[in-house]
Amino acid sequence: AGGREKAEAEAKRQAEIEERARARAKRDAREIWTAAKPGPDPILVDYLAARGLRFDPWPKSIRFDPAAPYKVKRAAHRGGNWETLHAGPAMVAAVQGPDGKFSGVHRTWIDPARPGQKMRLAHPDSGDDLKSKLTRGSIKGGAIRLTDPPGASVMVMGEGIETTATAWISG
């Protein structure tokens, strides 16, 4: 019985750790969203225009952070801590759960020196390329709703914001 009780206690402890991590991720996502500026920003408008996208009206689900921090976990010999590698412009999109409520964020770091391009970053320890798009919060089963017109009879879905927006804007 002692082994089973220990295993159950460990499973409960792990579940509590995971629940705290999920709650922290949701809080982080809300803070990121709240800190981002609503409405179009010239850097974001230029990025999207270089990709052939012009929103009218501007989606409420898209915001801009001029100095979004990009954090990486450093190698153990460097302390193993999270460190800000880059702070720069990012498109911030709200992710909504199936219930329509905010559940997370999707960020795309933009390279203003290269129109229409995402920021290129490499991990300082390994040199590996890093993703220019990151999410935070509860993303599974969620969607970034660019528009929600009343009485719509067609739904456009896609893998990425820019890809989906291209299909939506083209009609």
Predicted region positions:
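Phosphate-handling DNA/RNA-contact segment within nucleic-acid enzymes
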Residues: 70-171
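TOPRIM metal-binding catalytic domain and adjacent DNA-binding surface shared by DnaG-type primases
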Residues: 2-91, 96-99, 149
